Amino acid sequence: MDKIRKSDEVIVLTGKDKGKRGVVQRRVDANYLVVEGVNVAKKATKPNPMTGATGGIVDKLMPIHVSNVALFNAATGKADRAGFKDVDGKKVRVYKSSGEAVKV
């Protein structure tokens, strides 16, 4: 069970996008995430007449390491860590600072 999942709001802790917030769009593998509006790179694409795609420079979301982001706690307005707690026989993610459940 992952501490940071798809559709979680996260905040970037280090790097050129430090302080930016975004929503996790997908997990690339166990250690990398693609976050909306964070770590955007410019990529050159060739025109492809088969698909109708025009060539040029496009913005592409690049993966960011999971250690460089943290969950955003809306109640406190700060970055927070996640832990797990057993509630009614179910494993639930909770914020470490407050102990309340992470809302998806």
From Swiss-Prot:
Name the SUPFAM superfamilies for this protein: Translation proteins SH3-like domain
Which family does the record claim for this protein?
A: Belongs to the universal ribosomal protein uL24 family.
User: Biological process GO annotation list?
Assistant: translation
Q: What does this protein do?
A: One of two assembly initiator proteins, it binds directly to the 5'-end of the 23S rRNA, where it nucleates assembly of the 50S subunit.
Keywords of the record:
Ribonucleoprotein, Ribosomal protein, RNA-binding, rRNA-binding
Q: Which Pfam families match?
A: KOW, ribosomal_L24
The record's note on quaternary structure and interaction partners says: Part of the 50S ribosomal subunit.
**Gene3D superfamilies assigned to the protein according to its UniProt record, in alphabetical order:** 2.30.30.30
The Gene Ontology terms for molecular function here are: rRNA binding; structural constituent of ribosome
Q: Name one GO cellular component term.
A: ribosome
| Name of the featured protein | Large ribosomal subunit protein uL24
**Is Lipid biosynthesis tagged as a keyword?**
no
